Design a protein with these regions (language model features):
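C-terminal/peripheral segments of proteins
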Residues: 2-515, 520-523, 532-710
Length: 710
């Protein structure tokens, strides 16, 4: 263990220059808990838990509600929230060790805290800063009350920490982190970066014209890991200042990233346009800190930053790493040369403010005004409102590039001609607003097929230098097929489409399975039987499907290697391996998918339908375990269906994979798992009367118990 940690540190050092190395023991000191309690007294929020433990937070001010939201989330998942804060500071390796060191380095490389220190009070409005302060105060109050659970350096939290977290995460949605990690490892440049399963999501809106009952329907369905820093948390917020949203957020967010209110709602999937450029710099052979630009030698901005890494117990090592910046942006030096990165969202603090405005929006115009700030660098939004208006907005801060250059390749960094400085205005991004087709979708796919023709944007109307993606995910293919075939969608239809567990005939999975099924396995009894199963497979993953285990496990193993940029394993060898395992564990090659696909949480162990990139999106651990089963670890992280009826009534139904709490002792640790496994939704209580009828807990954080309403 000790040797492994030391070797890992040595490997990290090899990624860049080292100027200082010191081992030390960290003395764990506590923050001023009394000051945190005193600061918390300035806020007044009421947190009511419904029968599933979902927190409904109310308060007079938005800042009060943010305070209560932070406190409630800390009650449910304090360890993850603390790690989010440490990640934002570039201090996570001080707790989690070498595996977090590269992430810490990226915080410094991107210059996040330099920008915050310079412009926090300038770029962010007073209401936004007040909201951030309230959220930080909620986390600090919980930490003060649970000092024994506080990680080193995790408290006190400041509003600036939350801004740093947004600045770090937003560009990662379109793949900046993959590009940076690739360059740090000395790998090849991929523009745009490869899509990853962690970035999947789904959103669909149905207009009254396509609904059987004249209702407007919105599905928001973030898809990602079920636990950890990118897991989704469900809540409801109402304030006396007009904040009224139910939806989801990820740890460290004081705002809903996807949600719905009485007037409007929105969801998104991660889009992957070309929003970053890599420049090859011409270094000075006589001075490693100079590079050529427009005929002159310019000095790189050079900083040294500390990276504290926990080895074991209280023993830490602090390294000092070189951080370089050019006119283009952050610079990485590796064995292949000197590379600069320029990316959408660079040095922009206002992402959190844009989401704040979205949370407060009550019309399409106010919602798009928030996007028009240009502070959210990507994300493909779906919008719906109570008036029946729906829209798809392929949002992005698209660089205005000189079309004479090939922006799909690394660029010469020695001339100003390749240095873009402006973005296309929001008016120029692809949009579909109130289409005659009556529906829009977003499923990590091209915006040129987000509805039925002729209502789609035309690809030729957008410059190729915008780098807009043109491919379709399986979820997009299936959603288009199902919805285009139904002119009168009922509530039951819409739910069934969300939980559709099949693959399109032209999906990557179907193409791979067809190839394997059509091969000649004569003379190999095991593969002959496997091929027979694949030929009969209907491309679906319902629980009783007997073709799914062999087909899906094989396809997942092969296609995930493609997705992650690893060498592709030989498909027939993979098929043989899983055929052998199915025979070993189940006595047959075709057990039901329910026997193999499992949702596990504590003592809960339930069968699941679905698979990767299905509308019923489920991600699994690689391969199978020693019982022949595979455990779901990601996919449909939050499912919310918001409906505005013809007469203006608002309804929200939802489900998460496990429950609202990460504590094994909580009754809400896995109480939603049976619903999730069965593809069912719970109804969220939206009126005060409905909420109080099923309230399981009511509190006012930081206030005496006798002040809590009964």
């Amino acid at each position: 263990m000790i040797l492994r940690s030391i070797l890992a540190v040595v490997a990290f050092l090899a990624l860049g220059s080292l100027s200082f190395f010191a081992a030390h023991q960290t003395r764990l000191t506590w923050f001023d808990a009394g000051a945190a309690i005193e600061a918390g007294a300035k806020y007044d929020a009421t947190v009511v838990r419904d029968r599933y433990g979902v927190p409904h937070i109310s308060g007079r001010r938005d800042a009060d509600v943010a305070f209560g939201l932070a406190y409630a989330h800390a009650q449910d998942d304090f360890p993850t929230l603390q790690r989010a804060v440490l990640a934002a500071r570039g201090r996570l390796a001080n707790v989690d060790g070498i595996q977090a060191a590269q992430s810490d380095y990226l915080v410094h490389l991107l210059g996040i805290w330099n920008a915050i220190d310079e412009r926090y009070d300038i770029d962010l409005s007073e209401p936004t800063r007040a909201l951030l302060d309230g959220y930080a105060a909620g986390l600090n109050l919980y930490a003060a009350q649970h000092k024994g659970d506080v990680l080193p350096e995790a408290a006190p939290v400041k509003g600036q920490d939350i801004v740093a977290l947004f600045m770090l995460r937003l560009p990662f949605f379109y793949g900046l982190d993959e590009q940076l990690r690739g360059l740090l490892a000395g790998g090849e440049v991929e523009i745009p970066p490869r899509k990853t399963a962690a970035a999947r999501a789904l959103a669909i809106a149905i207009a009254p014209s396509r609904s059987a009952d004249g209702a407007t329907r919105l599905l928001l369905n973030p898809q990602g890991p079920f636990t950890g820093p990118l897991s989704w948390y469900e809540a409801r917020a109402t304030s006396g200042e007009g904040w009224n949203v139910a939806g989801g957020l990820i740890p460290g967010s004081p705002l809903f990233l996807a949600g719905a209110g009485p007037d409007i709602g929105w969801g998104f999937s991660a889009n992957h346009p070309d929003l970053l450029d890599v420049y090859t710099l011409e270094g000075n052979p006589n001075d490693r800190f100079f590079y050529r630009f427009d005929g002159d030698w310019r000095r790189l901005t050079v900083r040294e930053v500390p990276i504290a890494i926990r080895l074991f117990g209280p023993l830490r090592v602090t390294l000092r790493r070189e951080v370089l910046t050019s006119l283009q942006g952050p610079v990485i030096r590796n064995e292949r040369g000197l590379f600069a990165i320029r990316y959408a969202g660079q040095d922009d603090l206002k992402g959190v403010e844009a989401f704040y405005r979205m949370n407060k929006a009550r019309t399409y115009e106010s919602f798009t005004d928030a996007l028009a700030m240009g502070a959210i660098p990507s994300l493909d939004f779906v919008y719906a409102d109570k008036t029946g208006r729906i829209a798809n907005i392929y949002n992005g801060t698209f660089p205005q590039r000189d079309p004479s250059h090939d922006w799909t390749q690394p660029l010469a960094g020695n001339v100003s001609a390749t240095l873009w400085k402006t973005y296309f205005p929001f008016a120029d991004v692809p949009k579909v607003v109130a289409p005659g087709s009556g529906f829009v979708i977003s499923a990590n796919a091209t915006p040129f097929q987000s509805t039925s023709d002729p209502f789609n944007p035309k690809e030729e109307a957008f410059p190729s230098s915008m780098g807009i993606e043109t491919g379709l995910s399986n979820r997009a293919r299936r959603a288009l097929s199902l919805i285009e075939g139904d002119r009168s969608i009922t509530a039951a239809d819409f739910k069934s489409y969300k939980f559709d567990a099949c693959y399109a005939p032209d999906s990557d999975l179907a193409v791979l399975i067809k190839d394997l099924a059509e091969r000649n396995y004569a003379g190999d009894a095991l593969l002959e039987e496997a091929g027979h199963i694949l030929r009969r497979y209907d491309l679906c993953t319902e629980k009783e499907n007997r073709g799914a285990p062999l087909a899906l496990l094989t396809a997942i193993t092969v296609l995930q290697a493609d997705e992650q940029g690893r060498p592709r394993p030989e498909p027939v060898a993979v098929l043989r391996g899983f055929a052998t395992r199915m025979l070993e564990y189940f006595g047959r090659l075709d057990p039901t998918w329910a026997e193999v696909s499992r949702l596990r949480r504590g003592t809960v162990d339930l069968p699941l339908s679905g698979g990767p990139d299905a509308l019923r999106d489920i991600e699994f651990e690689p391969g199978v375990d020693d019982t022949g089963t595979t455990r779901a670890v990601g996919g449909d992280a939050l499912t919310v269906l918001s409906t505005w009826s013809r007469d203006g009534q608002w309804q929200v139904e939802s489900v998460v994979p496990y429950g609202s709490s990460s504590s094994e002792s909580s009754p809400h640790y896995a109480d939603q798992a049976p619903l999730f496994a069965d593809g069912r939704l719970k109804e969220l209580p939206l009126t005060e009367g409905a909420l109080m009828e099923q309230a399981t807990d009511i509190e006012r954080p930081g206030k005496p118990d006798d002040t809590v309403p009964q």
